[in-house]
Regions:
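The conserved SAM/SAH-binding core of class I Rossmann-like methyltransferase domains
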Residues: 9, 32-33
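Glycine-rich flavin
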Residues: 2-4, 21-27, 33-148
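Beta1/beta-strand and adjacent pyrophosphate-binding region of the FAD-binding site
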Residues: 1-12
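N-terminal Rossmann-fold NAD(P) dinucleotide-binding loop
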Residues: 15-16
């Protein structure tokens, strides 16, 4: 069992900011994230930044005024590739920002509570038992619209 001052479940905006701040104050921190494709959270990966990038590329395409469907298809393909490159770069920077810190350990896997102070992180190949004095849940949320 590995012991930490804090365990943060979720590598989104709140989790990464909290982990960096706690590490700056000398805390030994574990961060668990289910998906390598979500380091940095929704805004970086599937929300604000990629959608705004695609809007920008659509505007640029409009200025170029492609004359055929094939040209539009190529513009779209290039926009998707550019968006993927951007989000990949941001994910990598966010990951390195925490993983390069001496007092932060990033675990990529599904985290669940074993007890009030223990978390199990299951990866594709292993399982880690972590103990934390403080545990923060930063997993995001999904909107549910109730039937009326």
């Amino acid at each position: 069992m590995k012991k930490y001052d804090a365990i943060i479940i979720g590598f989104g905006k709140g989790g990464k900011t909290l982990a960096a701040d706690l590490a700056n104050h000398g805390w030994n921190v574990a961060v668990g994230e289910r998906s390598t494709g979500m380091y940095g959270g929704t805004c970086i990966n599937i929300g604000c930044i990629p959608t705004k990038a695609l809007v920008h590329y659509a505007q640029v395409t409009g200025y170029r005024r492609p004359s055929t469907f094939e040209q539009y298809a190529e513009e779209f393909k290039q926009a998707i590739l550019a968006k993927e490159k951007l989000t990949s770069l941001l994910r990598e920077k966010n990951f390195k920002n925490l993983d390069d810190r001496e007092t932060v350990t990033v675990y990529t896997g599904e985290a669940s509570f074993r007890s009030p102070y223990e978390i199990v992180v299951k990866t594709d190949t292993d399982s880690f038992l972590l103990e934390g004095e403080k545990i923060f849940i930063n997993t995001g949320a999904t909107t549910i619209i109730p039937t009326i």
